[in-house]
Amino acid sequence: MAKYNIVISGYYGFHNAGDEAMLLAILQALRKTFDAPSITVISGNPSDTARTFGVKAVPRFGMLPILSSLFRTDLLISGGGSLLQDVTSWKSMIYYLTIIIVGVLFRKQVFLYSQGIGPVRYRIIRIILKHVLNHVDAITVRDSESKGFLQRLGVHRTIYTTADAVLSLD
């Protein structure tokens, strides 16, 4: 049986304890769910991420390695954390949305995992967010405010509210 290929996109490889714990929680869940999955993480420090978590890793701004990984993957996971907000930076929001858009265009399964969504100040970004998220396969958010925001935005996919993935760590 072929290995199940998974790409994880998030704010990984920057030694942020919360984000690294989120990645660990996602990896634990995936390894319980799939038999020996092949996992690639998009990372700010690929060698450190690969060594620490026992995964493949590609550089955060290496477009060719990212595109190649997304082309070969079965599933793209975007999360967790508060990636889809433009208060910190509208550029980071566009970055994460672009990864999701490529996954959708490549016809991959795309899963938003344990996300905190918003706030989104810019109207054009809200429009893009609505259209992109109406094409993903699954959405889980970590709070009712994020769910309400997406519903008011016009995202018609089923949105599940779940605890922050870090709470599931073994």
What is each residue range found by the language model?
Residues M1-D170:
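Active-site anion-handling motifs in enzyme catalytic cores
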